[in-house]
Amino acid sequence: MTRRREKAVQPVGTRRAAREFVFRVLFEADRGDLPLDTVFTRAEGAMREGDDTFPQLSADALTFANELVRGLEKHRADIDTTLRRTIRGWSFDQMAQTDLNVLRLATFELIYTAEPHPPVIESAVRIARKFGGDDSGRFVNGVLAGLSRSLQSAGVAKADEQADTAQD
């Protein structure tokens, strides 16, 4: 077996599997204009019945996937606003649905979770490459790297403001 092939059959990490599961749920919900929680419940049932459309998840991965879905539901409007500000020269209508949903999922994690940015971005790029077009991985990487930098700059600015306020 070649190195590339060995790498391809290695098990997917819990968080990455959960992200891929949620990506599929998000894609299906958007495509069918259905509530995210309804599609998640249906996907969870299909997974438990052995439907290979949705990857099998461990209990920990399913818990993480559920947290992602709840967060996406709660913060969807803010996530879309952030993406509209971040992506220059593209409207949501011009973007592939695959790319947009990968970006939504990763943007939620970058803004609303304590996950380190590099693994979130790496997972998003892998999902984009797996399900998107030829340039999806590069596009997603560029958008998320820019967003990560701006969030880190804003975090530094906020930390500086809090330190100045505390000294007063």
Swiss-Prot record:
GO cellular component, one term: cytosol
Coiled-coil stretches noted in the UniProt entry, renumbered to this chain: none
Keyword set, alphabetical order: RNA-binding, Transcription, Transcription antitermination, Transcription regulation
MF-aspect GO terms: RNA binding
Record's keyword annotation contains Transcription: yes
Domain of life according to the entry: Bacteria
InterPro entries, alphabetized: NusB-like_sf, NusB_fam, NusB_RsmB_TIM44
Record carries keyword RNA-binding: yes
GO biological process, one term: DNA-templated transcription termination
Protein purpose: Involved in transcription antitermination. Required for transcription of ribosomal RNA (rRNA) genes. Binds specifically to the boxA antiterminator sequence of the ribosomal RNA (rrn) operons.
Family: Belongs to the NusB family.
PANTHER family: ANTITERMINATION NUSB DOMAIN-CONTAINING PROTEIN (PTHR11078:SF3), N UTILIZATION SUBSTANCE PROTEIN B-RELATED (PTHR11078)
Protein's name according to its UniProt entry: Transcription antitermination protein NusB
Natural source organism: Deinococcus deserti (strain DSM 17065 / CIP 109153 / LMG 22923 / VCD115)
